[in-house]
Amino acid sequence: MAAPEPARAAPPPPPPPPPPLGADRVVKAVPFPPTHRLTSEEVFDMDGIPRVDVLKNHLVKEGRVDEEIALRIINEGAAILRREKTMIEVEAPITVCGDIHGQFFDLMKLFEVGGSPANTRYLFLGDYVDRGYFSIECVLYLWVLKILYPSTLFLLRGNHECRHLTEYFTFKQECKIKYSERVYEACMEAFDSLPLAALLNQQFLCVHGGLSPEIHTLDDIRRLDRFKEPPAFGPMCDLLWSDPSEDFGNEKSQEHFSHNTVRGCSYFYNYPAVCEFLQNNNLLSIIRAHEAQDAGYRMYRKSQTTGFPSLITIFSAPNYLDVYNNKAAVLKYENNVMNIRQFNCSPHPYWLPNFMDVFTWSLPFVGEKVTEMLVNVLSICSDDELMTEGEDQFDVGSAAARKEIIRNKIRAIGKMARVFSVLREESESVLTLKGLTPTGMLPSGVLAGGRQTLQSATVEAIEAEKAIRGSSPPHRICSFEEAKGLDRINERMPPRKDAVQQDGFNSLNTAHTTENHGTGNHSAQ
């Protein structure tokens, strides 16, 4: 009797099908941004009150809201801002914050350091948008907080809250990519409603930029018409654009105001000008933003009459533009004691410059290969092949001319190949230069000149007194002063479309980009 055959093992199950193209995450710890846009029912409760935590959690994940919800938030916030005075009056205790510049994830850190808006009074000094890539998230979140806490959270206007700068820098493009031009226009209307200054505790004038030769009293500010695009000159422009002089407190000139050569508009004001304004208006100090600070803040020379710093600058965007390596700070004022709380930058999602997509980013590689092939195709032509069958009809000069034309074409394509090669090989340096030039474009001729030109690239300031040094390919910006020098051209008011030349230069003007949880406290009585 034959032995039974051994049982055969069941065949192994087929392997699971591969994930759809693009569905696999290279960095698996980083989740996809949610594709669902929050609806009205999710953002607002039955009474029309915003659910701020729902919105915050969604925005932190890079989520978006329905366009109609974005418009509702912006318009409701604007309606509250329109009812406020041009110079609002606020009381201590309060936390004063400087520039944010689209750094939404650092704004979340700011509220951790400064305290919950539910039980902390806040005053923001402007510049919520531009340069950073999460500006619309900053606007939506701050406007929702304004709707929730209209009497304890206050927003002033900065020089970037205008059509001119948001078109020139990144905010308009961001709105169109993430939402639409309708959302951008709604933001512009809301920005026109932002107050220009705040009087804190009847002791401090809080403003984005500083003083104006046309403003002598607080009533001069109260009388300004703020519901418009800021002009290129005048008191409204000065409140948003002016700066303390570079030798503030040690001036050699006795002129209170001088032309602001850094901004290309408005003025520098000096220590005597500030002291005179404080004395005439019975104030202790001026608190302003508008300038990046290595420590996140700066206290200037003390007033001789009060012994208090005559001027304080606060800046709340840490590691500005991802290159400044600066700390950020907020100012907490309570019981006549002023504390400065510093904080470092938080991790954030990465965007290519100017919201570039990966296909555009890959074009230099593709272009290099295509031009390389063209050069090779054209280069295999011998002198004999450059002649036609009817060569006897042409004289020697014509044949030489045809060969020279072909050679010129080969040289032109070779030059193009060189551009693409530099773009690909030096992409990191190109990124750095793009981020630190106002239009997001490299200086003309840099790429065609190859590596040597890239290493010595310069960006001319509008008045061209001095060119700003560029970055060499292997170099990384490693100090605050170096970043500030490279970014100096972006501090200027950009040229306006209706620019006219006056006195040899434009009368138009520009602006001013691993989480550490440590905070520092410094007190000034």
Swiss-Prot record:
<dbReference type="GO" id="GO:0034097">
    <property type="term" value="P:response to cytokine"/>
</dbReference>
<dbReference type="GO" id="GO:0005886">
    <property type="term" value="C:plasma membrane"/>
</dbReference>
<feature type="binding site">
    <location>
        <position position="99"/>
    </location>
    <ligand>
        <name>Fe cation</name>
    </ligand>
</feature>
<feature type="active site" description="Proton donor">
    <location>
        <position position="160"/>
    </location>
</feature>
<dbReference type="GO" id="GO:0005509">
    <property type="term" value="F:calcium ion binding"/>
</dbReference>
<dbReference type="GO" id="GO:0006468">
    <property type="term" value="P:protein phosphorylation"/>
</dbReference>
<dbReference type="GO" id="GO:0004722">
    <property type="term" value="F:protein serine/threonine phosphatase activity"/>
</dbReference>
<feature type="binding site">
    <location>
        <position position="208"/>
    </location>
    <ligand>
        <name>Zn(2+)</name>
    </ligand>
</feature>
<feature type="binding site">
    <location>
        <position position="159"/>
    </location>
    <ligand>
        <name>Zn(2+)</name>
    </ligand>
</feature>
<dbReference type="GO" id="GO:0004723">
    <property type="term" value="F:calcium-dependent protein serine/threonine phosphatase activity"/>
</dbReference>
<dbReference type="GO" id="GO:0023057">
    <property type="term" value="P:negative regulation of signaling"/>
</dbReference>
<dbReference type="GO" id="GO:0032991">
    <property type="term" value="C:protein-containing complex"/>
</dbReference>
<dbReference type="InterPro" id="IPR006186">
    <property type="entry name" value="Ser/Thr-sp_prot-phosphatase"/>
</dbReference>
<dbReference type="GO" id="GO:0046716">
    <property type="term" value="P:muscle cell cellular homeostasis"/>
</dbReference>
<dbReference type="InterPro" id="IPR029052">
    <property type="entry name" value="Metallo-depent_PP-like"/>
</dbReference>
<protein>
    <recommendedName>
        <fullName>Serine/threonine-protein phosphatase 2B catalytic subunit beta isoform</fullName>
        <ecNumber>3.1.3.16</ecNumber>
    </recommendedName>
</protein>
<dbReference type="InterPro" id="IPR041751">
    <property type="entry name" value="MPP_PP2B"/>
</dbReference>
<dbReference type="GO" id="GO:1905673">
    <property type="term" value="P:positive regulation of lysosome organization"/>
</dbReference>
<feature type="region of interest" description="Calcineurin B binding">
    <location>
        <begin position="357"/>
        <end position="379"/>
    </location>
</feature>
<dbReference type="GO" id="GO:0019899">
    <property type="term" value="F:enzyme binding"/>
</dbReference>
<dbReference type="GO" id="GO:0030346">
    <property type="term" value="F:protein phosphatase 2B binding"/>
</dbReference>
<feature type="binding site">
    <location>
        <position position="290"/>
    </location>
    <ligand>
        <name>Zn(2+)</name>
    </ligand>
</feature>
<feature type="short sequence motif" description="SAPNY motif">
    <location>
        <begin position="316"/>
        <end position="320"/>
    </location>
</feature>
<dbReference type="GO" id="GO:0043029">
    <property type="term" value="P:T cell homeostasis"/>
</dbReference>
<dbReference type="GO" id="GO:0048741">
    <property type="term" value="P:skeletal muscle fiber development"/>
</dbReference>
<dbReference type="GO" id="GO:0001913">
    <property type="term" value="P:T cell mediated cytotoxicity"/>
</dbReference>
<dbReference type="GO" id="GO:0010468">
    <property type="term" value="P:regulation of gene expression"/>
</dbReference>
<keyword id="KW-0378">Hydrolase</keyword>
<feature type="region of interest" description="Autoinhibitory segment">
    <location>
        <begin position="417"/>
        <end position="424"/>
    </location>
</feature>
<feature type="binding site">
    <location>
        <position position="101"/>
    </location>
    <ligand>
        <name>Fe cation</name>
    </ligand>
</feature>
<dbReference type="GO" id="GO:0030217">
    <property type="term" value="P:T cell differentiation"/>
</dbReference>
<feature type="modified residue" description="N-acetylalanine">
    <location>
        <position position="2"/>
    </location>
</feature>
<comment type="similarity">
    <text>Belongs to the PPP phosphatase family. PP-2B subfamily.</text>
</comment>
<dbReference type="GO" id="GO:0017156">
    <property type="term" value="P:calcium-ion regulated exocytosis"/>
</dbReference>
<dbReference type="GO" id="GO:0044877">
    <property type="term" value="F:protein-containing complex binding"/>
</dbReference>
<dbReference type="GO" id="GO:0007507">
    <property type="term" value="P:heart development"/>
</dbReference>
<feature type="region of interest" description="Catalytic">
    <location>
        <begin position="65"/>
        <end position="356"/>
    </location>
</feature>
<dbReference type="Pfam" id="PF00149">
    <property type="entry name" value="Metallophos"/>
</dbReference>
<dbReference type="GO" id="GO:0005955">
    <property type="term" value="C:calcineurin complex"/>
</dbReference>
<keyword id="KW-0963">Cytoplasm</keyword>
<feature type="compositionally biased region" description="Pro residues">
    <location>
        <begin position="9"/>
        <end position="21"/>
    </location>
</feature>
<dbReference type="GO" id="GO:0035774">
    <property type="term" value="P:positive regulation of insulin secretion involved in cellular response to glucose stimulus"/>
</dbReference>
